[in-house]
Amino acid sequence: MKNIRTKQTPCFRRWSRKGWAAFASLHRHVTIGVLAVTMSILLLATQHASAHDADTAAVLKTLRIDEVGISGSQSAPTRNVQSQTPLFDRKAQAAAPVQTLESALRLAPSVDIRERGGKGMQADIFIRGGSFDQTMVLLNGIDFTDARTGHQSHSLPVDIDCISAVDLLDGVPGVGAFAGAVNIRTAPLKLTYLRFEGAGGQHGYAYANLSGAVTSGRFSLLAAGSYRRSDGYRHNTEFANYNAFVRATYEAPRAGFFDLQAGYQNRTFGSNGFYAAYNPDQWEATSTALASLRWLKQAGRFSFGASASYRKNFDRYDWTRGTAMNRHNTDNVGARLWADYDWRAGTTSLGGDYAFNHIYSTNLGEALSRPHGRYTHAKARSTGNLWLRHAKQWRRFDLAASAGISLTPYGTSALWSLSGGYTPAPGLHLGIGAFQSMRLPTFTDLYYTSPAQINNLDLTPERAVTYLFDAGYMKNSWRLSLQTYYRAGRDIIDWVWREDMGDKWHSEQTSRLDTYGIELSGGYTVADGFLRRVTLSYGYITTDRNSDIIAKGAMDYMRHKAALAVEVHFLRRMSLALTASVYDRNGSYTHYPVPGDPSLSEVRDYEPYFLLDGRLQWEKGICRLYVDATNITDSRYCDLGGIPLPGAWGTAGVALTIGRGYAPFRLHSSPSPRAAGFFLPVGRQPCAAFLRASRWTGSGFGEVILARSLRQRFFRGGAFSSPCRVDSRGNGVQDSAPSSRGASRPSRFF
């Protein structure tokens, strides 16, 4: 009688970082843990094999761990990132009373959102006491910062429903991210879906949004379009905004991973007092088009990546509505190339990037010998960066260092960064870092003149060295974090009041500005019960400068900021989310009691203010109904220049979502970006992998390349893992028996 051997289904029982472990047998870092086993292996499993594993049919372990979004596979593709701080997460704040990106970021202790109008129609992003020009803005890891002015940098054609997360990237040395970088990441709600949202409310507010996604095989597509308008909450504050955005990814079997995104935005808005507080009749119109293409490829121990991007921006500003005063036409082109090598001593990265900025304008740049259409001025400049970085993780420690040079019209500058981390206990991580950064003067800094302002062509780059310390702890449903920083800034650019120049603002560089800050945050989050989420945060900033001058922007930072968010669920399908925040801004502004008359003015200090927002929501199946109320207490406040912002504003809306498939998977890990964790995909799949998080520390650039098949050599060192899923409570669960449906293909969006 023949002795028939039955093929057994292997199963991982535990995880470790030993040299003989299964993933270590691959002789490479597992950058992303989707090691999908082919269907043939699953189908060949016999009943005997299933019976063999019957002793593990129960859930082996349930992990309740924090989730961190990943958008990069290489370690620092362009510049080293010391840490990644989450500012917004769509899943965690799905029920929060936020309608725009600005309202989503307003509660973060690291960010100061300064609006001039309602619903984020014109706003600036300030990071940790820096100015809006010192903030780099990234969309899915691509730099789309506007070279003319930071006012336009985050005017991106993306609505809040397409944004999966927003992260603050600390320690991005090089040209641009003087105070830090904000990375906005997009992802579909489901693998394949169609969604419509409509809302209306006070002040003639109306909003309509149509979005959807298609995932087929190795191809994924996300597309969205929206229209938002209002009659305004006071004279000349009406607005209209159109957005269109598309993102497509494709993973070729041999060519690598391709990521294409493109978008267009058109907005017009009344600008009552926006740029001169005494003038109520200003008006502005902007149009922005952007696109980028990114490629990623892994070959053995090497990882390669390249990207190219383009942003086009038109801006028309009327001092008096209907009479064009300034027109600007800006082009920003970028390209990037890098390579990583993973070896026994760590991961070494080498790369470079190039940026070209050009502007046609009616008053910015050098005068043209012959007008170019309606434009009489133009200016162009190019910058480049080269860098070398090495990172190493050893037991509970991680270290990284980088060195590079920046090539600008102002000469060659050397840049560096250092970082280290230590994980003394599960859930606890300590990190420290230092980095050097710089920012070039914008075209507005160099050339803008007006009846109240004088330009300065002698400006040079701003420079800073920043020191960071962070600590994070998480256990079960609780999380705590502490961050402190000190930024020593030199040659800071600001508009300075000069009586000796006819009582005008003059673009100048003060010699020193030191900024100190501390941020505390804590939260409690569960997936069920009455109380679902409570978060509390506090931020404090103080500065020290070596000159006693009247500056327009450097000294009106947010000194104190505290925020509380609470979310409760009741009556099965109802939820209520409330956010309460207190703001205390340093500095003063000039108040004009009579609109249109600059001769009467007085200096006022910024007053503390309190904001309370809420959302009541009902959801069943494909339908979600909600009522929003912002500034419920009808507080009178301003973010800058004495421009009053809206009082109580109520809106209501409906969202209909038809789709299938799970939401795109997320990477779950410990509270620190440098600590190791587990990959637990959403949905039921035969996969689970251990991640060495040092591979993506501070990425935020580039996409993770997904492994589509498990090579035979993998089985020489161990068997593949048991299936993973996420239960109804949102916990990662590791099972023992594979699903009969086989592996569902995850989305490539993050």
Question: Residue spans of the language-model regions?
Answer:
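N-terminal periplasmic "start-of-domain" segments of outer-membrane beta-barrel proteins
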Residues: 62, 66-96, 124, 132, ...
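Extracytoplasmic beta-strand/coil segments of soluble accessory domains associated
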Residues: 102, 106-146
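Flexible loop and strand-edge segments within Gram-negative outer membrane beta-barrel domains
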Residues: 230-237, 241, 251, 255-332
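Structural signature of Gram-negative outer-membrane beta-barrels, strongest in the C-terminal barrel
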Residues: 262, 345, 349, 369-489, ...
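Outer-membrane beta-barrel signature, preferentially recognizing the C-terminal barrel domain
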Residues: 275-299, 423, 429, 436-490, ...
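Gram-negative outer-membrane beta-barrel transporters
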Residues: 392-396, 486-488, 509-591, 633, ...
